[in-house]
Amino acid sequence: MVAKTCGAELKFIECAKDGSIDLEKVKELITSRTKIVAMTQVSNVLGREYPVKEIAKLAHEKGAVMVVDGAQSTPHMRVDVTDLDADFFAFSGHKLLAPMGIGVLYGKEEILEKMPPFLSGGEMIDSVTRTSAVYAELPHKFEAGTVNAAGAAGLKAAIDYN
């Protein structure tokens, strides 16, 4: 929907019959015009792990941001986002047996610093006047409203369990 709204062209990485990805074909898809490369680390359909680290390198060589869906990988394997060099890494808590409605979005600090908040309120505001607001430092800059404390406690317990 976002691509349609802003006129972006979506390109898809095709899988072989065995579910593998040809890195040479990926290399052809990522150009200097590519802004975002988004993919799953492990397929929920095929159960296959993909070469996210190698694809992140290709994306970064062209100046693109790498976004990784870790919903299927985080419950089953140790994930090191810095080793993957993912700019963003997201997973839902319920896949780890945490309560519904909580998840994690990791983002590189230098990217998050440049991003404006998309919600407002609560502790995300450091100071406010009648004409302007100063946002709090990370991570509070993106935490509008009341924190889901019960969900966070459940997520921690689920991570410890896994």
Pin down the residues of each PLM region.
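Pyridoxal 5′-phosphate
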Residues: M1-N162
